[in-house]
Amino acid sequence: ADNLKEERSNSFSVSADLYHKFGNVQTNLLIEGFYTDLNNVFALRQLDKPDAQGNTVQERYNAYGAKVLGLNLEGKAMFTRWFTLQAGLTLQQSHYDEAIAWNDEVPEQKYKKMMRTPNTYGYFTASFTPVERFTASITGNYTGNMLVGHSAGSGVEKPVAVTTPKFMEVNMKLSYDFTIYKYLTLQVNGGIQNITNAYQKDFDKGWNRDSGYIYGPALPRSYFVGVRVNY
């Protein structure tokens, strides 16, 4: 838009970092609350006139204000020298001050909730080193439901805002280090990415598909092997 203003924000946060030892288990817990007030939030609208090639043109403009607030929890525990566990969880709300239409073709579909902002997401990492040079790790990423815009095309006849499913992606990696010469080390590794096969099931197909209708983990279940040289 011709009169586009910069997006501004005011943010506040408070946190507590706690440490405690339960027997031989060393633990750490971080608790953080956050609040952000956004002004002149950027949004997109479709112009009536296409460009010279006939493509639809979307214009960035200043919408209403918005607020983002939530709670972040992160914990770490070292059970032994060979086993550590770390995990985090974020609970948040992201809303515009007033409901806005996410697509000009369906002005009746108005939402206060921001697109592609799940209310809940988190992660975990578990690392095992039972013997020297060998490491096994299991990691996971959780993404809660969120709103995603699905434009008209091969998938749907008219634009619709879709509530995506929850995803829990779990990965596993095994690695072993071989000393080749003095400080030169060769690592051989392999594993499985996205063991749970948490993956989008409703991709659009065809020439008129909505290429932006993509969400969730980037890859389905897959296997990998690799080598790395450290010195």
Protein language model features and the residues they cover:
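Extracellular/periplasmic, surface-exposed regions of secreted and cell-surface proteins
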Residues: 3-4, 42-44, 73, 93, ...
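Membrane-embedded beta-barrel scaffold of Gram-negative outer-membrane proteins
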Residues: 5-61, 67
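C-terminal beta-signal and adjacent terminal beta-strands/loops
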Residues: 37-40, 85, 141-151, 176-231
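Residues on the lipid-exposed face of transmembrane beta-strands in outer-membrane beta-barrel proteins
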Residues: 14-18, 71-77, 87, 124-128, ...
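Extracellular loop and loop/strand-boundary signature of outer-membrane beta-barrel proteins
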Residues: 1-3, 56-62, 106-113, 156-162, ...
